[in-house]
Amino acid sequence: MKTSPSPEHKFITEPQYLELCKACDQILRAQDSTAERVAISWLHVIREHPAFLPKYVAIFESRQNLQLFFQLKARPVINYGKFLFRLGKTLISRVPNFHVLNISSKPYDVVFVSHLLNRSHIGRLNDFYFGEVPNELAMRGLSVAIIFINHTEASARSIQDAWRGSSVTRIVLNKSLSFPAEFALHQRAAQESQRLTTLRKSLMPALLRRIVARSAAEALESSTLTNMRIASQIRTLIAHLRPKVVVSTHEGHAFERVAFAAARESMPEVCCVAHQHSALFRLQHSIRRNLSAPYNPDFILASGVISQSQLKNAPELRHIPIMVFGSTRILKPTGGIKQTPTASMFATHKSKNNCLVVPEYDWSECDTLFEFSLECALALPNINFVWRLHPLISFKSLLKRNRRLRARTPNIELSDRTLEEDIGRCQLALYRGTTAVVQAVMGGLTPIYLQMRGEMTIDPLYEIEKGKFIVRTPKEFAEMIGTPRDTINGATEQDRAELVDYCSRFYVPMDFQVLEKIIRDAPERAQANTAERNPEPPSPF
């Protein structure tokens, strides 16, 4: 059972990562850059997470390996086949118009761009990303719409019928456009691919040439066309809804940038607001960097005081107002959770040692943490390990995929309880990149970060040095178990209190009044914002 990277697994080093970020930004910011280029997801380096980096490993190889050859030569052929298949589907099945409920003929005050990740989210009163804010604004007399990017297999009609009678308009984007529109998208992507191929011939540094060559192939990827498709529909909808403000989730993805550009093409005076909803990691990149004016937000709404500070420290964002807005990821107290976060939470006064194991929404991260904890469970039968999954992953699918995890020991439990209930019965939290550790610390658990050899840290608590454990092997985990909780890394009671305080500022409750003020002030600011933006060619979306 592996608890460290296999020999054939290759990591990108930190210097390589920084070089990659710089090169991709150079391509995106080039004078000949187009909206199609900005739509290439591969050029937007999100962060240093192992789940994001494998697709970049091949470009750092000294010799052209099989993976790079596949990406540059075989992949375009596959993508062209997918394009023909999608084009054929548009001929035999009519693409529906937007199925809209409760649409107003008057201009809207605010339009949210959100996501439907799971069928269970359909019909819920509160939005997964924006919580009760859309409803609160509607109750205060503002006209509100939510545009959904649909990640489920449910039809737009069935999704929107679930909200029939709601005071908030809901619109689901189509996954396909008409035959002419799909053909036009592919033609534009192909033209950008050709431009990048031509650009490659004029470049000298070998790494930059490889990145441009890969970008030329990525221009024809389905992810690029999906981003362009989203932008095309956003442009149409914004022209119809005519909102004062557009609010989108913001993590640094390409579709967020082209959505802003598309909205501004339809309404140059619209105010674009970005909601930073995910944790920021040490080397998180694309959310912290500036592109040309059409693609940048006018405001950034931070999920907490910590992320506001981290974003304000980004040199390229100094011209953008950054305000604390809040997050839906607030721990909901239950009877099993300690109500007042204090340093005494770290004391172990329960007779049962339960360790909560919380991976991210990523298969490889589930494998890493669960396989590691399985080894620990074999060595430490007195410790109970509570395996918890992201809501979008099931144990049935996980165990079907990874047979090694079927050999569980009696001291491993597959949890079907809420996060709050699991936190309330555990004393330890084994984690890697998940922000659930923030709620765990607030609930009194001792955080234990699993660091894999050869990789950059993905610890969301990277700014904190004391009050947590860092382990690399099951042996180190066992040694940690024998360490009194009041001597964590030499931390004092004050250090542990500061960790709890840090986590209390990581996410804060959402304050709809922050956004309401932006909406109310939008008419006065619109003319000034339009004039201040650098005059650039409009987006073709």
Where are these regions (language model features)?
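Catalytic-core helical/loop segments in enzymes performing group transfer/polymerization on anionic/lipid-linked
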Residues: 1-541
